[in-house]
Design a protein with these regions (language model features):
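N-proximal low-complexity "stem/linker" segments adjacent to membrane-targeting elements
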Residues: 1-29
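A conserved acidic beta->alpha catalytic loop
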Residues: 26, 43-52, 93-96
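Glycine-rich, basic loop-to-helix element that forms the pyrophosphate-binding segment
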Residues: 68-84, 105
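Short aromatic/hydrophobic "clamp" motif used to bind/position activated sugar donors
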Residues: 89
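Conserved donor NDP-sugar-binding/catalytic core segment of glycosyltransferases
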Residues: 101-134
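A recurrent flexible, glycine/aromatic-enriched loop bordering the glycosyltransferase active site
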Residues: 145-167, 180-182
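Non-catalytic, C-terminal membrane-associated alpha-helical segments of glycosyltransferases
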Residues: 224-228, 243-297
Length: 297
């Protein structure tokens, strides 16, 4: 007989064994009956001991560790949802440690609504890796002032902390497999769901912690990959051209800027300063330039 769960947590991973252990420990410490949820982790061919972790991990809740060839985040998550037994899915990441009330909060949100609804929780980024986290050294990824239950735009469909009925995901065909690099596969699904009038609501009590510090230099490099994925998004939804940053002014500035010219050199010097307005401007410019280089090249 297929076990009955209220909610399935789906996580994709690749070479993240140490932090994944912390994440799984977080699900061991949930303030709810362990029989009402399952955790599915889909590994994309890790070589760091993740498979040993799968073999040794024996929690009270149902755990399913799956190993497959690397098909990107979309492939891992689609596989996880396909085997999930529950009618409701949480998508999160292998470096997102859940608050003890994380599962219960998502479950209660879906119990309380009669219509198929998606819920976006709160992910707290950490400025330094320390557990338990210091509240003074965390900040919300979503910084806007939002109210509990507030209806959100599709661009808030962020899969570090989002839940939805499995039936909606299946009806939409899941994450688009064309997105193999960094970013946009989640927002693209969110956009399709909003086109079908599926509501996305804010759930601030559903909290997890992003146990990973990304440096500004890493962000600048990563924005190239983000731009490359945005190019795929543009090909599927050309009506989003301006939302994706391709307004005439930004495109003109990019085309007039040489990657080895004086403007880039100046912005790099400003970015390397310790603080101040020039540092902020330099960092912002390099992030934007990297993103545009990904989407336009």
């Amino acid at each position: 007989m297929t076990p009955t769960f209220e909610i399935s947590v789906v996580i994709g991973t690749f070479n993240q064994a140490p932090v994944l252990q912390r994440v799984l420990d977080g699900y061991t410490n949930q303030n709810c009956d362990p029989g009402i949820f399952e955790v599915i982790v889909v590994d994309s061919g890790s070589t760091d001991g993740t498979h040993d972790l799968f073999a040794q991990f024996a929690p009270r809740f149902k755990f399913n560790g799956i190993i497959q060839d690397n098909q990107g985040k979309s492939g891992a998550r689609n596989r996880g949802v396909a085997v999930a037994c529950a009618p409701v899915i949480i998508i999160t990441d292998a470096d997102m440690i859940p608050h003890p009330d994380f599962i219960e909060t998502h479950i209660q949100a879906h119990r309380s609504t009669a219509n198929p609804t998606c819920f976006e929780g709160v992910t707290l980024n950490m400025t330094e890796l320390h557990w338990p986290p210091d509240p003074n050294k965390t900040y919300p990824y979503i910084r806007e002032s939002l109210k509990n239950g507030q209806k959100l735009g599709w661009y808030y469909f962020l899969t570090g902390n989002v839940s939805f009925p499995k039936s909606l995901f299946v009806a939409e065909g899941g994450f688009d497999m064309d997105f193999l690099g960094y970013g946009w596969e989640d927002l693209e699904l969110g956009y399709r769901l909003q086109q079908k009038k599926v509501p996305l609501r804010f759930l601030p009590a559903a909290i997890n912690y992003h146990y990973h510090v990304v440096s500004e230099d890493d962000e600048i490099k990563r924005n190239v990959k983000k731009g490359e994925s945005a190019r795929i998004m543009l090909s599927k939804h050309p009506e989003l051209k301006w939302f994706l940053g391709l307004n005439p002014l930004s495109v003109l500035i990019y085309k007039l800027t040489s990657p080895h010219g004086s403007l880039i050199k100046t912005m790099t010097k400003w970015h390397q300063k310790k603080s101040g307005l020039r540092k902020q401007v330099g960092t912002w410019f390099l992030k934007e330039y990297s993103y545009l280089s990904g989407i336009l090249n």
